[in-house]
Regions:
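Glycine-rich, hydrophobic membrane-spanning regions of integral membrane proteins that mediate transport
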Residues: 1-303
């Protein structure tokens, strides 16, 4: 995680330098991506909401600073509704379909015996594919809930807000608005579980790949000709495999932390706790902002 943060700091300074010298710099890649713009809007909106919550608790709702922060938060919320609509159908929809296909493929593979490697126990094969199927199922739940929120409910509420004569009754509007919180709570919970399953699956898969390399199953691909060369190439390949796997695990850990913070925010938003509404709003906004920053940094590091 420290290495990712270190690379992020170096990458940020380089990105701002290249902003004026290279058209295809990292900042341009982030901004040109619907997902990147969505994360930028989410971070800015969360910062405005936290500011408004703190000002409301300390100074009240009548100050100019609170009114400004509230308007900024609402404006960024509307902007994110528009941005996320494109992200929902351009990125989330195909990813959800792919997760569903992968889930069913792993479920089918878990029921079939391993033909090429009879030494592998059937139980191990079932566990491996079952773990991946569960992770894909969590990704599918996350995709469906995201599509429901940002591909259907939020756009409907936004259009209803723009019309001179809204087509939704107050009761329907409040019901849809309340449902968003619970749907996204399911999204965040599924993402936490899915990230944990991905970490477990990645560790197991990495161990399996390293064992295959040690057993010589990849010698033809690696191109080793003698025993000493084989051993050297195997060790380098194992080191590279572990390094790549560790990077994927780090990103999964960051995703888990991000979504866990959003789960904490959901807890303070949706569950009646024995603390004042102002403190609940501040804690929820702080957790959401922290999660948004982690998500933006992770996306930046991958871009």
């Amino acid at each position: 995680m420290a290495s990712i943060c270190g690379r992020l700091g170096v990458g940020t300074s380089e990105a701002f330098r290249s902003l004026f010298t290279r058209p295809g710099n990292k900042l341009a890649r982030v901004v040109n991506s619907a997902k990147g713009v969505d994360k930028l809007a989410k971070t800015a909106k969360s910062a405005a909401e936290l500011t408004a919550s703190i000002l409301e608790h300390t100074e009240g709702t009548g100050t100019d600073s609170f009114v400004t922060a509230s308007k900024v938060a609402k404006g960024l919320g509307d902007a994110r509704t528009v941005i996320a609509l494109g992200n929902a159908f351009n990125g989330s929809l195909p990813a959800t379909v792919q997760s569903a296909r992968s889930c069913f493929a792993h479920l089918q593979a878990a029921r079939k015996p391993e033909e090429k490697r009879p030494n592998v126990l059937m139980k191990e094969v079932c566990v491996t594919h079952g773990r991946r199927a569960a992770a894909d199922a969590c990704a599918m739940i996350g995709g469906v809930t995201y599509l429901t929120t940002f591909g259907a409910i939020r756009p409907v509420l936004f259009v209803n807000k723009l019309l001179a004569k809204p087509f939704l009754s107050s009761q329907a509007k409040n019901g849809l608005g309340s449902s968003v919180g619970y749907i996204m709570a399911a999204n965040h919970a599924a993402s936490v579980v899915g990230a944990g399953l991905n970490i477990s699956a990645e560790r197991a898969d990495c161990d399996e790949r390293c064992k295959r390399i040690l057993n010589g199953e990849a010698d033809e691909v690696l191109g080793a000709n003698n025993d000493l060369g084989k051993e050297s190439v195997r060790q380098r390949e194992i080191a590279g495999e572990k390094s790549r796997s560790l990077t994927r695990i780090k990103y999964s850990i960051l995703t888990m932390i991000e979504k866990f913070l959003e789960c904490v925010a959901d807890l303070f938003k949706l569950v009646p706790l024995p603390i004042t509404q102002g403190i609940r709003a501040i804690v929820a906004a702080g957790c959401t902002l922290s999660a948004a920053i982690i998500g933006l940094c992770t996306f930046w590091s991958k871009a």
